[in-house]
């Protein structure tokens, strides 16, 4: 069973391990080499992120398999700073379920944004399937945005 919970400092070793596995595996889909965004493989960076972002543990049957970091820019604008899953659980719909769960947890958010490396066609297709539209290129990254309409009562 999939669960998404708020991270605590004690979770950061597992989050760094799964992040390293996920981002380093991107060499299989076009990355120029192993690596990821700043601090992607650092437990200490994760602990610092707890102070400025909403960090989540993604677990399947109690085992940490990934994570996510949200950055609130305003009451109605949320940035998906990072989301990752270990390669062993990718391709099974977990990523789509995680994004849907994150959106449901923030019903006031109308604008979701993220970026991904331009070379990562797999991510670009994934985000498009989840309702995100490419809205620009910033250096080597593609920016995405998803607008969510307010639900009308009744």
Region locations from a protein language model:
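Conserved beta-strand in the GNAT
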Residues: 57, 63-72, 79, 84
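Conserved beta-strand-loop-alpha-helix junction that forms the acyl-donor binding cleft
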Residues: 87-90, 113-124, 140-141
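Conserved acetyl-CoA-binding loop-helix of GNAT-fold acetyltransferases
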Residues: 85, 91-104, 125-129
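Conserved GNAT-fold acetyl-CoA-binding loop/helix
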Residues: 17-45
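A short helix-loop-beta-strand connector motif used in the catalytic cores of GNAT acetyltransferases and
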Residues: 43-57
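A short beta-loop-alpha structural element at the N-terminal edge
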Residues: 3-17
């Amino acid at each position: 069973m999939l669960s998404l919970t708020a991270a605590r400092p004690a979770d950061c070793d597992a989050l760094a391990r799964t992040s390293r596995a996920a981002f380093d595996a991107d060499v299989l889909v076009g990355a120029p080499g192993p690596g990821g965004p700043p601090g992607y493989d650092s437990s200490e960076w994760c602990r610092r992120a707890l102070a400025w972002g909403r960090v989540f543990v993604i677990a399947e049957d109690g085992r940490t398999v990934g994570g996510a970091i949200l950055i609130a820019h305003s009451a109605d604008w949320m940035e998906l700073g990072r989301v990752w899953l270990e390669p062993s659980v990718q391709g099974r719909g977990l990523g789509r379920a995680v994004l849907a769960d994150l959106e449901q947890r923030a019903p006031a958010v109308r604008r979701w944004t993220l970026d991904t490396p331009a070379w990562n066609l797999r991510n670009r297709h994934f985000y498009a399937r989840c309702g995100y539209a490419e809205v620009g290129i910033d250096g080597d990254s593609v920016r995405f945005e998803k607008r969510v309409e307010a639900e009308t009562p009744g």
